[in-house]
């Protein structure tokens, strides 16, 4: 039962889409594999090359690391930046180190970090 690869390819080329779908399902069952996983693995190297430059971080988190001496001013900045109420902002400041704002653009994160620094706090961007 020696069938040449060319004969197999010709048979597959002459199949309808429905017949190909059934063939794939039967092959998945017989060999215990998934055609979807193979397609993802085959596409991964091509996507990996294109995704390498896109790995630059686009979302940043501003972390309040230390309050400093002017706690009231820091609470005011946290309230202005986050829209939190007085109690929530105070709890955030008291619980430092904590994230002030997450998932924001780099420019926004730098502006918030600057405002916190001007209020006497120490903040970092992650």
From Swiss-Prot:
Domain of life per record: Bacteria
Keywords from the UniProt entry: Ribonucleoprotein, Ribosomal protein
Protein family according to the UniProt entry: Belongs to the bacterial ribosomal protein bL12 family.
Subunit note: Homodimer. Part of the ribosomal stalk of the 50S ribosomal subunit. Forms a multimeric L10(L12)X complex, where L10 forms an elongated spine to which 2 to 4 L12 dimers bind in a sequential fashion. Binds GTP-bound translation factors.
PANTHER family: 39S RIBOSOMAL PROTEIN L12, LARGE RIBOSOMAL SUBUNIT PROTEIN BL12M
NCBIfam families: L12
Function: Forms part of the ribosomal stalk which helps the ribosome interact with GTP-bound translation factors. Is thus essential for accurate translation.
Name under which the protein is recorded: Large ribosomal subunit protein bL12
Organism ancestry: Bacteria, Pseudomonadati, Pseudomonadota, Betaproteobacteria, Nitrosomonadales
């Amino acid at each position: 039962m020696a069938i040449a690869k060319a004969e197999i390819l010709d048979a597959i080329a002459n199949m309808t889409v429905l017949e190909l779908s059934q063939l794939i399902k039967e092959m998945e069952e017989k060999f215990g594999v998934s055609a979807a996983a193979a397609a993802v693995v085959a596409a991964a190297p091509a996507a990996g090359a294109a995704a390498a430059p896109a790995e630059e971080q686009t979302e940043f988190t501003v972390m309040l690391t230390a309050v400093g001496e002017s706690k009231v001013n820091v609470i005011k900045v946290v309230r202005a930046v986050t829209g939190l109420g007085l109690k929530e902002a105070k709890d955030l400041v008291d619980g430092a180190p904590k994230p002030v704002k997450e998932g924001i653009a780099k420019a926004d994160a730098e502006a918030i970090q600057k405002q916190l620094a001007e209020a006497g706090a120490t903040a970092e961007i992650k």
